[in-house]
């Protein structure tokens, strides 16, 4: 394990031609080779190493262009097959480990990918060359680009957006908000008064989210910019993210990067040359500032980046200051003052005479303040300073502690990879077991499995488990919690599942009392074992559902039901505050990815970060256990007891 001083430090090991395409024997080998070749070694929060694929950022940008094309085509009334072809291409490219920028140079190899034909190859070549292509440009002459913002409003789909454009020329969120406030939507076909109110709620969510970015978006940007900065050569000692990204906040407003200057490269001439190099990063949209030791700019997606150039002696103080939070820093400064010291971004020093006491590392600053080192995720002034003073900080869970992933989807429902492919990818990440949890029948939009299909699916998973896959594959399901709190499968099917994950995908707007009763009914079902994405939020898009969390957690503790910390960057659900409540109430937690393709499996690092923010330790998260102990920790089903992971019939009924 790496020292905490190196937490979140990005380092790179790239060859001169890191993206050259070799000739592997098969597609799996090609995927593995590309992943190894294109990854950047990074240090994960808490001292765990993880690998970040640099090219994913470029692929994501290309995927975004295709996805926007699909949305514009659907608004334009194109047939489903046409716009779905662009959606599928976007999904494929988003998850692809190889660089599309390189693959377009070998069109025949590119056409080996499913759904990529001659026309799509031409589109991709044009996008790589110019950043856009003719079809999207044509559509954006017909519709304003802001019309895509309307699809972020939870109550509006492409057909309604198209209708509002044709009738009112409503092409912005402000246009739709005005129509709703004037009561002009409720009389329209397919809308109504309730829909109008939901649109106004969605507008408020949109306004609150403006200027915020998902954690993986900020992480992608930090990695790519760090690689660029390191190319400056000997002048750069290290590049370290700070701010809310380092603290693991669920969304990020801006990005702070600290560049430590190497010995012998601290003159203003060296600093100016490095600043000039930084501002040559190809993704910059606008330069905001260029000072003596700081450059600021915005990226093409609107994310503001502040890069500060530091000498080694000040690195620890600067990292502490710019990591935050503001509340944590204020509390530390108050403590320093009480000890006759002063703390700022340059050093910890004496109040009298300003004699330097510490500043090179965060550890030495905390030590001089008579505190244990406080991990970045805990720095929110919610009791961590008192805990550090009394040596009672938790030993936070780490990525290396994780042994399994308990929510993922295969091609049986809405996943993009087979069970075997998901298992192989999970094994490569170091997992010992996974649960395949395809959707139940109520989620028709996700190709949910009816009881007959699920029974066959369970048998298929059991058959795979007999093979030597190098990883245990558990038969699970993501079972919908229906409006009345009942589960979407019969007891007969639920009894056959090894892992029963329950979640809400409908009726999000029930009142607090009704939603609480719905959740309690699901938890009281003797087959329920895990509640997935428990508040149903979609970050920057949809507010959480409203229920009495105290009552729900009390019921989970009583019945042995675990709460999920969903690692998907759009969700990160449960949030840190509720995870800490779980710990305090003895509620078990699982960290799962909700993966829909093999590339999503690495998202587990985000779930670990949220768990750390919630003060969770290894013992609080049951999928840190080996598979037999994990199965024993799950709520036992009616008539079944577990000993050492083996199921045994019980004489008594119930829990």
PLM-predicted stretches and their roles:
Residues 476-479, 606:
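Active-site catalytic microenvironments in core metabolic enzymes, especially phosphate/sugar-handling
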Residues 56, 248-339, 344-410, 418-430, ...:
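Charged catalytic cores and adjacent phosphate/nucleic-acid-binding surfaces used
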């Amino acid at each position: 394990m790496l020292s905490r001083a190196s937490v979140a430090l990005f380092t790179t090991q790239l060859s001169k031609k890191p993206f050259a395409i070799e000739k592997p024997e098969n597609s799996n080998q090609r995927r593995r080779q590309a992943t190894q070749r294109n990854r950047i070694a990074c240090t994960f929060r808490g001292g765990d190493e993880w690998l970040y694929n640099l090219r994913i950022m470029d692929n994501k940008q290309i995927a975004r262009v295709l996805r926007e094309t699909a949305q514009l085509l659907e608004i334009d009334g194109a047939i489903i097959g046409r716009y779905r072809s662009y959606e599928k291409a976007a999904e494929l490219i988003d998850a692809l480990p190889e660089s599309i920028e390189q693959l377009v140079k070998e069109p025949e190899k590119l056409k080996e990918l499913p759904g990529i034909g001659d026309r799509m190859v031409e589109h991709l070549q044009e996008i790589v060359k110019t950043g856009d292509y003719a079809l999207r440009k044509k559509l954006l002459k017909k519709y304003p680009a802001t019309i895509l913002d309307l699809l972020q409003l939870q109550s509006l789909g492409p057909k309604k957006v198209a209708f509002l454009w044709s009738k009112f020329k409503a092409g912005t969120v402000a246009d739709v908000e005005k129509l709703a406030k004037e009561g002009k939507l409720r009389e329209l076909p397919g809308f109504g008064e309730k829909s109008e109110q939901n649109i106004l709620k969605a507008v408020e969510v949109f306004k609150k989210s403006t200027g915020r970015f998902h954690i993986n978006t900020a992480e992608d940007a930090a990695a790519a910019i760090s690689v660029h900065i390191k190319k400056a050569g000997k002048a750069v000692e290290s590049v370290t993210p700070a701010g809310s990204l380092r603290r693991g906040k669920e969304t990020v407003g801006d990005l702070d990067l600290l560049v430590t200057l190497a010995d012998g490269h601290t003159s203003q001439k060296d600093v100016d040359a490095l600043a000039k190099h930084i501002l040559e990063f190809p993704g910059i949209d606008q330069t905001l500032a260029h000072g003596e030791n700081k450059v600021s700019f915005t990226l093409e997606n609107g994310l503001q980046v502040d890069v500060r150039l530091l000498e080694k002696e000040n690195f620890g103080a600067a990292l502490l200051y710019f990591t935050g939070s503001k509340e944590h820093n204020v509390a530390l400064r108050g403590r320093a003052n009480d000890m006759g010291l002063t703390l700022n971004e340059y050093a910890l020093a004496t109040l009298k005479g300003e004699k330097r006491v510490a500043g090179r590392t965060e550890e030495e600053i905390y030590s001089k303040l008579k505190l244990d080192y406080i991990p970045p995720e805990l720095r929110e002034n919610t009791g961590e300073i008192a805990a550090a003073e009394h040596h009672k900080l938790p030993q936070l869970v780490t990525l290396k502690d994780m042994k399994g992933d308990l929510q993922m989807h295969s091609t049986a429902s809405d996943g993009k990879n087979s069970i075997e492919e998901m298992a192989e990818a999970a094994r490569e990440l170091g997992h010992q077991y996974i649960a395949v949890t395809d959707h139940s029948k109520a989620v028709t939009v996700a190709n949910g499995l009816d009881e007959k299909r699920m029974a066959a699916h369970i048998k298929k998973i059991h058959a795979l488990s007999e093979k030597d896959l190098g990883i245990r594959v558990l038969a699970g399901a993501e079972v919908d919690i229906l409006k009345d709190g009942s589960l979407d499968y019969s007891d007969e099917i639920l009894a056959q599942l090894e892992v029963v994950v329950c979640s809400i995908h409908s009726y999000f707007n029930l009142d607090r009392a009704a939603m609480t009763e719905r959740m309690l009914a699901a938890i009281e079902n003797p087959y329920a074992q895990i509640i997935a994405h428990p508040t149903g939020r979609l970050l920057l898009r949809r507010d959480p559902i409203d229920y009495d969390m105290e009552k729900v957690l009390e019921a989970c503790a009583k019945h042995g039901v675990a709460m999920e910390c969903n690692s998907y960057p759009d969700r990160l659900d449960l949030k840190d505050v509720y995870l800490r409540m779980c710990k305090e109430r003895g509620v078990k937690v699982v960290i799962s990815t909700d993966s829909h393709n093999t590339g999503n499996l690495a998202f587990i690092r985000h779930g670990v970060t949220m768990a750390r923010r919630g003060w969770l330790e290894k013992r609080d998260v049951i999928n840190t256990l080996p598979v037999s102990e994990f199965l024993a920790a799950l709520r036992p089903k009616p008539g079944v007891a577990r000993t050492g992971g083996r199921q045994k019939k019980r004489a008594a009924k119930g829990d």
